[in-house]
Amino acid sequence: SEVVSFSFTKFNPNPKDIILQGDALVTSKGKLQLTKVKDGKPVDHSLGRALYAAPIHIWDDSTDRVASFATSFSFVVEAPDESKTADGIAFFLAPPDTQPQKDGGFLGLFNDSNKSIQTVAVEFDTFSNTWDPSARHIGINVNSIESMKYVKWGWENGKVANVYISYEASTKTLTASLTYPSNATSYIVSANVDLKSALPEWVRVGFSATSGLSRDHVETHDVLDWSFTSTLQAPSDDSN
């Protein structure tokens, strides 16, 4: 079987194994800061993404097999005005040559003109766009900015959120959970996702985030740590 596994307890300010896109950078303290901060304050119209450098084999056409994976990370979203937040952060899988898309509500993952962008994402969405439910939510997105499944999210300003996302290939189940250790609340959402029809055989995995498009709807998006493991079974693994 093919196994990819990596873990960052913090990030290197000059990362060799992370591709930074847009405004993303690693701070001197080892935080992955996806959107821009100036004089300690988040900036509007910011878009940043970070990808693990090595492409990952997510399914194999010759054997018809699909990988299972699990990832966990911690992040903080902090807003100067907690009644005005935008726009959110996502974990995503996309083709290896993936580039930042539209900012604002499109979370750097999608745009309104190209409807065929191959991207599977779990979004932590802090602003209700026209296509969104009316509250902050955690959504599963398959080749669309509109979530196919979502759960309401009681976002906590400036608090560390622990996320665990898993994909079980045998049942095609993508599950995401978010927990706030500070008040022991948690949220879970899952959906049936066929990675083989949604994505190419090889992908890159990573994060994308955008701040709002007006000066008063802004927030920070910082990833503190990240681990990931995927396993693509070889045909011989179960021949007997």
Swiss-Prot record:
Alphabetical list of PROSITE patterns matching this protein: LECTIN_LEGUME_ALPHA (PS00308), LECTIN_LEGUME_BETA (PS00307)
Chain coiled-coil ranges: none
Glycan attachment positions: 111, 183
Post-translational modification: Partially N-glycosylated at Asn-111 and Asn-183 with the heptasaccharide [(beta-xylosyl-1,2)(alpha-mannosyl-1,6)(alpha-mannosyl-1,3)]beta-manosyl-1,4-GlcNAC-beta-1,4-GlcNAc-beta-1,4 [alpha-fucosyl-1,3]GlcNAc. A small proportion of alpha chains are proteolytically cleaved at 114-115 into gamma and beta chains. This is probably dependent on the deglycosylation of Asn-111.
Binding site for Mn(2+): 123, 125, 132, 137
UniProt cross-references to Pfam families, sorted A to Z: Lectin_legB
Binding site residues for Ca(2+): 125, 129, 132
InterPro entries: ConA-like_dom_sf, L-lectin, Lectin_LegA_CS, Lectin_legB_Mn/Ca_BS, Legume_lectin_dom, Leguminous_Lectin
GO-annotated molecular function: carbohydrate binding; metal ion binding
Domain of life, source organism: Eukaryota
Keyword Calcium in annotation: yes
Keywords of this entry: Calcium, Glycoprotein, Lectin, Manganese, Metal-binding
Tissue and organ expression note: Seed.
Keyword Secreted attached: no
Note: Binds one manganese (or another transition metal) ion and one calcium ion. The metal ions are essential for the saccharide-binding and cell-agglutinating activities.
Function field: Lectin that binds galactose.
Family: Belongs to the leguminous lectin family.
Subunit structure: Homotetramer.
Official protein name in the record: Seed lectin
Organism: Vatairea macrocarpa
Phylogenetic placement of the source organism: Eukaryota, Viridiplantae, Streptophyta, Embryophyta, Tracheophyta
